Amino acid sequence: MKDELFKQSPKKQFEFDKSVASVFDDMINRSVPFYRENLELCGNLLAKILPTNASVCDLGCSSANFLIFLANLRKDFKLFGVDNSASMLEVAKSKAKAYGLDISFFEANLCEFDFFTCDVFVANYTMQFIRPPKRQELLDQIYKNLNSKGILIMSEKILYEDAFLSKNIIELYADYKEKQGYSKFEIAAKREALENVLIPYSQKENLNMLEKAGFKKIESIFKWANFETFIAFKD
């Protein structure tokens, strides 16, 4: 379905409810620049470097796009998805079933999730929705539960520290969304709904959190304006 949720002024803060779940795939493909290309980059990289029967857990898996892509690349992967939205998980499970894929899903608040050890954790556009006081604790849990030589892939919307640059990057991002078919009204309405819900950090703040969690080797593997993907390795 086409995302037309913000053609009217929002009556509540943004949440991943049934209305969002029904249009999520269209929404994210039109709202996150190079979403599919970045998903495929990360998936192909993991498929290339991970050993047989590696375990991958997507934290904030939404509609399972990344897990489904991985499952079709490598049949040996053990795949898990966690999300706090029952509506999003309903979509994820339906898609996985339609493709005949064996993916285990868990409905849970990530800050209260009973973590298990994995070779890879993925947090694509997830941390930005976690309340700031809880983010470091969550990253600490991720690091703790990664197996030796484990990997974290983390994609985030980011802030620029320079106010002038930040203003112009935000305007360019709005231009991008207009080119994807969103009106100025829809863009403004969604921004209003996301205020104090999606709270981005700067690149430096994200790197500091990763380092504090214990990661020593951290690289940026994708960036477009105010979107960036980091890969971090556990020793």
UniProtKB/Swiss-Prot annotation:
<feature type="binding site">
    <location>
        <position position="124"/>
    </location>
    <ligand>
        <name>S-adenosyl-L-methionine</name>
    </ligand>
</feature>
<feature type="binding site">
    <location>
        <position position="191"/>
    </location>
    <ligand>
        <name>S-adenosyl-L-methionine</name>
    </ligand>
</feature>
<dbReference type="InterPro" id="IPR029063">
    <property type="entry name" value="SAM-dependent_MTases_sf"/>
</dbReference>
<keyword id="KW-0949">S-adenosyl-L-methionine</keyword>
<dbReference type="InterPro" id="IPR005271">
    <property type="entry name" value="CmoA"/>
</dbReference>
<keyword id="KW-0808">Transferase</keyword>
<dbReference type="GO" id="GO:0002098">
    <property type="term" value="P:tRNA wobble uridine modification"/>
</dbReference>
<feature type="binding site">
    <location>
        <position position="35"/>
    </location>
    <ligand>
        <name>S-adenosyl-L-methionine</name>
    </ligand>
</feature>
<dbReference type="GO" id="GO:1904047">
    <property type="term" value="F:S-adenosyl-L-methionine binding"/>
</dbReference>
<feature type="binding site">
    <location>
        <begin position="83"/>
        <end position="84"/>
    </location>
    <ligand>
        <name>S-adenosyl-L-methionine</name>
    </ligand>
</feature>
<protein>
    <recommendedName>
        <fullName>Carboxy-S-adenosyl-L-methionine synthase</fullName>
        <ecNumber>2.1.3.-</ecNumber>
    </recommendedName>
</protein>
<feature type="binding site">
    <location>
        <begin position="60"/>
        <end position="62"/>
    </location>
    <ligand>
        <name>S-adenosyl-L-methionine</name>
    </ligand>
</feature>
<comment type="subunit">
    <text>Homodimer.</text>
</comment>
<comment type="similarity">
    <text>Belongs to the class I-like SAM-binding methyltransferase superfamily. Cx-SAM synthase family.</text>
</comment>
<comment type="function">
    <text>Catalyzes the conversion of S-adenosyl-L-methionine (SAM) to carboxy-S-adenosyl-L-methionine (Cx-SAM).</text>
</comment>
<dbReference type="InterPro" id="IPR041698">
    <property type="entry name" value="Methyltransf_25"/>
</dbReference>
<dbReference type="GO" id="GO:0016743">
    <property type="term" value="F:carboxyl- or carbamoyltransferase activity"/>
</dbReference>
<dbReference type="Pfam" id="PF13649">
    <property type="entry name" value="Methyltransf_25"/>
</dbReference>
